[in-house]
Amino acid sequence: MPGGVNAVYMGLCYNCGGNIDEDRLEKGLPCARCLPSPPRRATPLTVYRALKKAGTLGAYSWEYLSIREVERFEAYFAAKSGSRLWSAQRSWAKRLVKGDSFAIIAPTGVGKSTLLTVYAAYVAAVKRGRVLYLVPTENLVRQVYAKLDQVEPGIATAYYSRMPAKARESSLEKIASGGARLIVATTGFLSRRFDLLHPQYKFDLAIVDDVDSLLRNSRNVERILLLTGFSEETVEAAHSLVKARLKLYRALHSGASESIVSRLEQEIAQLEARLRLSLSEASPGQLVIASATGRPRGVKHLLFKELLGFEVGGGSDYLRNIVDAYVVDSDPVGRTAEIVSALGDGVIVFVSQRLGKDVARAIAGRLEGMGVSTALALTGARRPVEAFARGEARVLIGMASRYGVIVRGLDLPERSKYAVFLGAPSAKTHLLEALYSPRRMLAFLSIAQEKGVEWAGEAFRRLSRLLEKVIDTSIVSLAARGKLEAQGPAGEAAGIISETAPRLVDWLVAEARLQGGLLRVGGLVVDARGPIPYLVVPDAPTYIQASGRVSRLYRGVMTRGLSIVVDEAPEYVEALGERLKWTTSSRLRPLSEVDMEKLRREIEESRRGKGRRVRVKTTLLVVESPTKARTIAWFWGRPGKRRIGRSVIYEASVSDPETGDVHILQITSTRGHLTDLTTDSVGSKYGVDEDGGGYRAYYSTIKRCLDCGAQHTSSSPFCPRCGSPRQVDSKSVVEILRKLASEVDEIVIATDPDREGEKIAWDVFLAVRPYNPNVRRGRFHEVTPRAVIEALRSGESVEKSLIEAQKVRRIVDRWIGFHLSTHLKLKFSKPWLGAGRVQTPVLGWIVDRYREWQDTRGYLVIFKLSSGGRTSYFTQNRLEVENLKRVEWLEVVDIAGKTEERNPPPPYTTDEYLYDASRKLGLSAGLAMKIAQDLFESGLITYHRTDSTRVSPTGVKLALEYLASRGLEGEAQPRGWGEGGAHEAIRPVRPIDAQDLERAVLSGSIRIPIRLTRLHIRVYDMIFRRFIASQMKPATLDIVEATLQAGETVFNHAGVARVRGGYALVNPPRVEEWLARLSPGDRIDVEDVLVVKSSLKRLYRAGDIVKMMREHGIGRPSTYAKAIEQNRRHGYVIESKKMRYLIPTKTGVSIYDYLSNGFKKLVSVDTTRRLEEALERVEKGVEKPEAVLASVWRMVDEAVSLHAATGDVMGQSEA
């Protein structure tokens, strides 16, 4: 390409596996060697034909053949069903025709059953394969068989126990003889008649509709695997491996000896080898599971993961168009009867499990007595549901059980309009048993501690410290119950729980009875109204799943519905609302606020197909971090999960409330950058070549060593650091992304909204573009459901100017870094040494300050006062120190005071955050950024790499909501703190402080994908207080400056004596109350005098360096911490343990002196700043990349030439 920087991606041509230019990938074309004369418009068909004509068709032939197979199936589907594949169906069809085994996770109404029915007939009739179709009930056997008979008459053989005797015998004979091509039966048939199927049948396709019915008998998992072609030896090997991994997991987290752990690791390695060998000889059929919801128990379901690469579980139906309301009444049964009677036809009543089946019978009787026809569905019988479906019963009544027949198995959109919950859905456990959960124990101990219970505070502190060292708290829970023996911290924690639980039960019961018998703690309720105290946990997933029966996709519209919770206790309703607040956008409101006339009209019209049409899209959402992927996946219920190689792909569904679009998401991560400049001997300038006025930069996929963790971009099969051949290559991620891209309608790349994130996004775009042209860039600055939905909605593209600037930045860093590092390694004969464009000026600041510190060393005399305060005085005079050590009091010579109104500081930018994290919490820059990254990716704070103080309207609203909840609305003063723009300051994304966050996590109201440590809480607290304070009125400060005399020495001490109102109520400055009590002539007794070595010039901390980097313009939010950490990694700088001061090592001083003398032009602050400014101009499009690179190469060349001319010859060692 003329001018600019053209990236060449080594080994990423999708047809031949050779090198390919980025402009080719951007157009969806293979490399120039494969296709010298490309077609005008690149489509799979035109590219395939051109490659075939050129005689260079390679790996792309498989993709084309897959496309053709999908087209053949689509034609069959259209002919047999009378309609074309919907978006979601097409996505699944692509996976089906490739032979993938997987679980379908999707909302009701998108065509799963229709697709699978037609596909089953297609495999049996067209592919001549054998098919097994399993469903949970006999009623469904009849329905599926009838549909199959319409698609391919006579192709299916159905069996269920209530068939006419002659038909039943005929089916059994056909199955037993081996003559059945497509068998439809219940999962019960699999258990009872397995001997008819195995070993004579090896199914090419097995479909399981509703995995829970399969898993009720864990042996069925093995049976279905055997029927799809796995040998008994393979299944047994997989089962043994699963059990061995669980044993190792428990051993590691229960303090088992090293010999036990080592033995288990060896056993696992042997089992893995055995399983790999078995799988290499296997040719299994295809297993597809639909409606894979729920939480499988036991370990057998993990065989699907080991053998087929997917996991069952997940998929709560969070797509709803429902008004959520509640009523509190002392007679909930009577009030429920009134409400149901008034609603009329199409009501489903869900009775809470804590109330029991007798209450379900009671409400049915009450309604029948009022003349309302009901159907009571307390078992799996089909008749009540059929009566409701036919309109013979106006009301259907059942239990609010996650796996209940009317919660999971009901799909009657035209009939189901209203959901009424008699009692908030919940489950109850004996309180003592519940407290064996470490998290719940901590949640309740924190409440007791807050109320001044000393023993609870001590137990909380001890247990918290121990649990910090325990990865899996379930080990502690089992040990506390006496079901497992645990050692170390886990065992100690279990002991504390066992001792504390009975005492805590007594305290909670007493507290609950003071409040009428019910005590709500966040999303939990202690019920002490009876002789046995219980912990009641609201079941938000069941509420969402059950209420979803009255709202689903139907006739292209999401039907409208109404859900009403009726309970006698407001605590239960509030606890359910608390749980819903964190997991969904649902908010319970009083029924009296609902406009029933309008809502009834909307409910009826939506069932006639009126209303906003819903478009269903399949979307691949790509992020860079596995943590961020997990956070997003859990926003809309328990996600499905599949594994391809080392990648995890989560599956979930989400509805956009503004557009009505439904996205069936596949969410995965790149695990960081995919490519970087190669270190191979390619190009004349360290992986870069001049190219007709521009440059060609050679990028290679990134390899990571599995033994030492080192990363490299060479083509060597061995790690350059330790020589190990065990490494993973990001090329495998590229291949997985390409596979996923070919399965979906669109790809949204939602990597971080900064330069690094843009480069990752560009690499992903180029990787998938040949497989799917519908690629968009999604950006969000907070990981929240709202932000993700907005990103899915946006139609942005990758910013080319940012990419161009990032390429230039990387090349500049490579040129300067490689030149300097090469000199250092040869000069000092130490191969690990290195230097960099920003790293070296930072080292210079640290070295210079250290020298200043040494030159001004002295003594800090600290006086500990009887008034409770402290003051200090610095001197370099040793005799003065000795005199001051004998001082018994300080005399107040003079007092000066003033009162000032002080505005709050703005919310944090990255540099200010790092400064305070270092100063207040003693964190290194690297650890501070790691903690902030965790909080961001877990959906707790906004993006942490920012130089903006701007607060969005959403942020302002959040602060006002929090202040109102604390009765501080009168202290609010909203501020935007900056002009409009994409970036925001660092702030929380929820109106909850650190204490409430910790309780919500401990009680299970909030689920986050990381272990929330005390350090996470402290950092969150610091960010939260700073942000809330920024939205408050100024505080009034009384400032006192006292002139004090100690013996012959006179010195001053100034500080804040009092603070009143405003932001100080949330984020107070340091207050020294003893100053307010001083008057001239007072004597203050000195309790103790401490003398420590000090200096007039304090050593820098990480926060000081970050501030200087911003002030001098030599860094960006994404590089602040990295520059310091690189100096530490090379051994140039250490950090003092207590005060976190940065101290240069002897090597660091030598390196800096050598570079600053020999390569001053390359490592000076001025040069680094000018380069940063030039890169900013490239980013803005006002300077050409090639001009900057040419200038930098000349500068490097001149510096090297000048260095050589001064007499220092490369290769001459200091030795």
Swiss-Prot record:
Give the highest taxon in the source lineage.
Archaea
Q: Which residues bind Zn(2+) 2?
A: 705, 708, 719, 722
Task: State how the cofactor is bound.
Answer: Binds 2 zinc ions per subunit.
What's its top-level EC category? Answer: isomerase
InterPro entries assigned to the protein according to its UniProt record, in alphabetical order = AAA+_ATPase, DEAD/DEAH_box_helicase_dom, Helicase_ATP-bd, P-loop_NTPase, Reverse_gyrase, Topo_IA_2, Topo_IA_cen, Topo_IA_cen_sub1
Mapped zinc finger ranges (RG C-terminal-type) = 702-729
Q: Where in the cell is it found?
A: Cytoplasm
Tell me where in this chain the Toprim domain is found. Answer: 618-783
Q: Which UniProt keywords apply?
A: ATP-binding, Cytoplasm, DNA-binding, Isomerase, Magnesium, Metal-binding, Nucleotide-binding, Repeat, Topoisomerase, Zinc, Zinc-finger
Q: Any idea which positions bind ATP? A: 89, 106-113
Q: Name one GO molecular function term.
A: DNA topoisomerase type II (double strand cut, ATP-hydrolyzing) activity
- Indicate where this protein is primarily found: cytoplasm
**Which residues are the active-site ones?**
943 (o-(5'-phospho-dna)-tyrosine intermediate)
| Stretches that traverse the bilayer | none
Segments carrying motif DEAD box: 209-212
Q: Which cofactor does it need?
A: Zn(2+); Mg(2+)
Show where the Topo IA-type catalytic domain sits.
Answer: 799-1200
Q: Give the domain section of the comments.
A: Introduction of positive supercoils requires the cooperation of both domains. The helicase-like domain probably does not directly unwind DNA, but more likely acts by driving ATP-dependent conformational changes within the whole enzyme. A beta hairpin in the 'latch' region of the N-terminal domain plays a regulatory role in the enzyme, repressing topoisomerase activity in the absence of ATP and preventing the enzyme from acting as an ATP-independent relaxing enzyme; it also helps to coordinate nucleotide hydrolysis by the ATPase domain with the supercoiling activity of the topoisomerase domain.
How is the quaternary structure described? Monomer.
- Miscellaneous comment text of the record: This enzyme is the only unique feature of hyperthermophilic bacteria/archaea known and seems to be essential for adaptation to life at high temperatures. It may play a role in stabilization of DNA at high temperatures.
Q: What does this protein do?
A: Modifies the topological state of DNA by introducing positive supercoils in an ATP-dependent process, increasing the linking number in steps of +1. Binds to single-stranded DNA, transiently cleaves and then rejoins the ends, introducing a positive supercoil in the process. The scissile phosphodiester is attacked by the catalytic tyrosine of the enzyme, resulting in the formation of a DNA-(5'-phosphotyrosyl)-enzyme intermediate. Probably involved in rewinding DNA strands in regions of the chromosome that have opened up to allow replication, transcription, DNA repair and/or for DNA protection.
Q: Which PANTHER family match?
A: REVERSE GYRASE
Q: From the Swiss-Prot or TrEMBL record, give the protein name.
A: Reverse gyrase 2
